From Swiss-Prot:
Organism: Arabidopsis thaliana (Mouse-ear cress)
Topology of the protein relative to the lipid bilayer: Single-pass type I membrane protein
UniProt name for this protein: L-type lectin-domain containing receptor kinase VII.1
Extracellular-facing ranges: 21-286
Binding, ATP: 353-361, 376
Amino acid sequence: MKALLFLLTLFLILPNPISAIDFIFNGFNDSSSNVSLFGIATIESKILTLTNQTSFATGRALYNRTIRTKDPITSSVLPFSTSFIFTMAPYKNTLPGHGIVFLFAPSTGINGSSSAQHLGLFNLTNNGNPSNHIFGVEFDVFANQEFSDIDANHVGIDVNSLHSVYSNTSGYWSDDGVVFKPLKLNDGRNYQVWIDYRDFVVNVTMQVAGKIRPKIPLLSTSLNLSDVVEDEMFVGFTAATGRLVQSHKILAWSFSNSNFSLSNSLITTGLPSFVLPKDSIVKAKWFVFVLVLICFLVVALVGLVLFAVVRKRLERARKRALMEDWEMEYWPHRIPYEEIESGTKGFDEKNVIGIGGNGKVYKGLLQGGVVEVAVKRISQESSDGMREFVAEISSLGRLKHRNLVSLRGWCKKEVGSFMLVYDYMENGSLDRWIFENDEKITTLSCEERIRILKGVASGILYLHEGWESKVLHRDIKASNVLLDRDMIPRLSDFGLARVHGHEQPVRTTRVVGTAGYLAPEVVKTGRASTQTDVFAYGILVLEVMCGRRPIEEGKKPLMDWVWGLMERGEILNGLDPQMMMTQGVTEVIDEAERVLQLGLLCAHPDPAKRPSMRQVVQVFEGDKAEIFEAESSEDVESWMLMKMGSRGSSREFWYGSSSHPTIEQIRLQSLSVSLSSWNSSILEGR
């Protein structure tokens, strides 16, 4: 009885013999009954071939008996060690894909799996399902974003999902752990892999077949497989192709859950090679074609270089001749190119603060990093850019007014790169303050907007009457009004400007400017005048006060919209809603209404009915004597005298006698406004 009890106790404490399994394949027999094949998997010449050139196909091979993976008493996962030699053999002139997986599966067959990026392991619906009970190590040669693959040549540990729990680029570490040497999975070479699992740690190591196993694993991670594997599982390999194809092959395989040195018995040398041979360049069919093409390209390149050199020299000579006159005549000093290049950090794109039709504008520092400037670099390939450069030098170079951007200097590089250097305007362009939603920008108040419009009017008056010659700006718009540190407006961009004698007729016939700001007569005849500048200024007034661009998709043109509001007695509804929420707007609401009326008058379609810029400035100044002296026409004097004494509501004037105002009424009311709080003289430039 004691002997029987002893034998029973011994049986319970000793490992169950059915839990131990060892097998080794140094090649596979065609008639082997130890491996079950599924899909397109075959055994050829003692090599287990999982896939071939068939597109969108799956091949799977499993050991034909289940393997106990859990201890029958403790239910803990049994350790195991497996090693195999595989190759991904590419086909000539075919892109290779997709990959191979060593796996534990609860059942045989390939049902529930898809080809291509799913590697014959899962499909679109069951990927990531805990009920899969699949553990695998993938060798993947395609980076699938949906699975968060790290690259197109990686090894990953998969648990019920193709989203690897741990992955790394395929390769191995040097024994000192300092140098990582990548291995290309699908280059046709034979690779040996070692996968060990014990004490809840998975180690994956790989190396070129025939070489010593690296000391440091490629992958090593803690992993509890208790909820993943079942008591008994099938073990083997699966691979798949898609539009990309290659042959996934297993040349040798060992597995044990008791002997971790069994892999030493694998034959790793003398194995067939599947690396594609390299064709001789001379024998290649495309060699002659490429050689002829190269010769042709060389000849063409030499011809183009010679043509470019000759053309550049002729262009340089032409431009040099063109520039000689004004270079000697105009005072703005020439700044060395090296200083400008250094100040803009080599025209770094990070310093771009604006882009115009003929070039970019960069922020820079001159005079040892002390002076902030804006550098306008005009395209050397543009004839318009050349004309713009000469125009700005010859006009803006000699103009001096507090409401015009100051030109500090210019630069003309020999190769034809033209630059204009201006004072830097810290607060950028006016349209940025009107239209951009920027936390750093506060909404301009009504009083600030009127002050800015007053300054712009002063600058335009100086151009028309205050200088030795008459200057037509021809491109007045919100983006060409810059604001300095003190929010003083400065009119900029004189690239379209033209200079004429005060008594000289204007001979422009070319339509230039910006859509929405062009006066009707410019569109019809191409002729610019001081009145076309007045028209553009009127549109600017409406734009600034209403917070709307001249032309917006799906909306009426700005001028027509404001005119309609005025006819209905609702002109105040046209004011910018953001501006109406600013502090103090009610105190200047009458002035805002009159400025809108002034804008409408300036933008009248009949140039003869528009005021001059002198009249506009005098409206802002409120100097009655100057208004009177500025006009000689008897009818103009009569309406000015009549309206200067009127302090009644403008709405009474507009709508007291008729339902629709006339342009003469607009002219009378607008030009009789007295804004007495604005008393600084702006008729002289300074």
